[in-house]
């Protein structure tokens, strides 16, 4: 009887060992089959204090129709001036209308940098030097981050690439891949997704083309649900494309409902991994909005985005420096005082957010913005760590 018990125990132990061995081997094989994904973590140890440099700024900055030596000098002046205003990050416009502010082999040269550039031939045939390369070098030389700013779908003010078209998505990914060959710190999308006034291009040809609104096929706006579905496909692909290479951010308009209706799926982006590394809502109002001047619109919209951000995606707030001193546009705060921007920055800091971005560079030197800029500069050298932003790529 005792021998039988011993034999039974022995066989049980052998069986368990065999199962463990098989499971271990299976697990090892499974690990071989599915290699681990590298996770890149980018940390900001201080707040982002940024400015958008738009294609509309280029001429005043001395970047249009100039020789390489002059461009390089003026790009460096731009970066130094940004630093004087407490800026540590520049969002530089590299794609405004399906074009390129760099020596692209696919896209035409941006005419806001070279006014006589070919409308059909790629930028390599128009630029004798590479504007983006020089801007990146100037920024990094002075310790400023440089993010490449793209309007993904916009072809003209009235016409956009169709987000529904796979060709449109592939075309934008080509632009992103080209830009990632430069030492940019980020890829940044503006809020233009479904905003075309006249229609959307459905481009089925891979050959180079020139825009002709009169003959373009149009694919008019689908339902809001489909809009978000089409745009989400692009956002996921860009996130994957930038993995381990650059930070991917999107700057939506400041009205959550309008965003959701125009293809900006904030609910999904701010609740899930794999979409955006950082969100930058454009909250372009004061807390003295409306006929009465008593509506706290900035604070209200800021709260909406914070509540929407279930995943705690790093958030930087776009601020409307360009509206400083404005009268009669339904937002009395801009004409009432010159401390709106500095007050908004303080609010951003109180909420522990990632920082702010000013629209746009030329307004730093515009007469009616002087008071706002002066008050902003008083608090721009805020050194304390506000939030440690960790960007994990999966």
Question: What are these model-derived regions, one by one?
Answer:
Residues 63-83, 165-178, 258-274, 333-349:
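Short, acidic/polar
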Residues 89, 267, 271-295, 302-394:
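Substrate-binding cleft of secreted/luminal carbohydrate-active enzymes
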Residues 81, 103, 108, 122-125, ...:
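Polysaccharide-binding and catalytic clefts of secreted carbohydrate-active enzymes
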Residues 73-100, 181-186, 274-279, 348-356:
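Catalytic domains of carbohydrate-active enzymes, especially glycoside hydrolases
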Residues 19-36:
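Sec-dependent signal peptide cleavage junction
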Residues 41-73, 122-125, 131-137, 145-182, ...:
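Active-site-adjacent "subsite" loops/lids of carbohydrate-active enzymes
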Residues 87-126:
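Aromatic-lined carbohydrate-binding/catalytic grooves of carbohydrate-active enzymes
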Residues 2-24:
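Sec-dependent N-terminal signal peptides of Gram-positive bacterial secreted proteins and lipoproteins
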């Amino acid at each position: 009887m005792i021998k039988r018990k011993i034999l039974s125990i022995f066989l049980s132990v052998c069986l368990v060992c065999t199962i463990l061995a098989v499971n271990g081997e299976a697990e090892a094989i499974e690990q071989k089959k599915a290699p681990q994904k590298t996770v890149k973590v980018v940390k900001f140890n201080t707040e982002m204090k940024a400015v958008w440099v738009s294609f509309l700024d280029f001429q005043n900055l001395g970047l249009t129709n100039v020789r390489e030596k002059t461009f390089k000098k003026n790009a460096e002046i731009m970066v130094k001036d940004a630093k004087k205003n407490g800026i540590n990050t520049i969002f530089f416009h590299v794609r405004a209308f399906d074009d390129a502010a760099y020596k692209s082999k696919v896209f035409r040269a941006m005419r806001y940098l070279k006014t006589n550039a070919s409308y059909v031939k790629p930028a390599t045939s128009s630029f004798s030097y590479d504007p983006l390369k020089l801007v990146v070098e100037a920024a990094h030389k002075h310790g400023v981050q440089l993010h490449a700013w793209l309007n993904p779908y916009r072809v003209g003010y009235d016409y956009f690439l169709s987000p529904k078209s796979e060709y449109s998505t592939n075309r934008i990914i080509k632009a992103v891949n080209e830009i990632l060959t430069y030492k940019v710190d980020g890829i940044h999308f503006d809020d233009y997704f479904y905003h075309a006034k006249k229609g959307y291009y459905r481009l089925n040809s891979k050959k180079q083309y020139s825009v002709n609104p009169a003959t373009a096929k149009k694919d008019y706006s689908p339902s809001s649900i489909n809009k978000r579905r089409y745009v989400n496909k692009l956002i996921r692909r860009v996130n994957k494309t930038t993995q381990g290479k650059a930070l991917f951010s999107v700057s939506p308009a400041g009205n959550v409902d309008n965003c959701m209706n125009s293809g900006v799926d904030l609910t999904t982006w701010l609740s899930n991994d794999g979409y955006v590394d950082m969100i930058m809502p454009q909250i372009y109002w004061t807390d003295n909005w409306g006929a009465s001047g008593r509506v706290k619109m900035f604070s209200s919209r800021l709260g909406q985005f914070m509540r929407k951000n279930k995943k705690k995606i790093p958030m930087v707030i776009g601020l409307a420096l360009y509206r400083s001193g404005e009268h009669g546009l339904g937002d009395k705060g801009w004409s009432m005082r010159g401390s709106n921007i500095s007050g908004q920055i303080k609010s951003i800091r109180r909420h522990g957010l990632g920082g702010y971005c000013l629209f746009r560079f030329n307004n730093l030197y515009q007469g009616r913005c002087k008071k706002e800029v002066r008050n902003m500069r008083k608090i721009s050298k805020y050194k304390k760590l506000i939030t440690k932003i960790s960007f994990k790529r999966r």
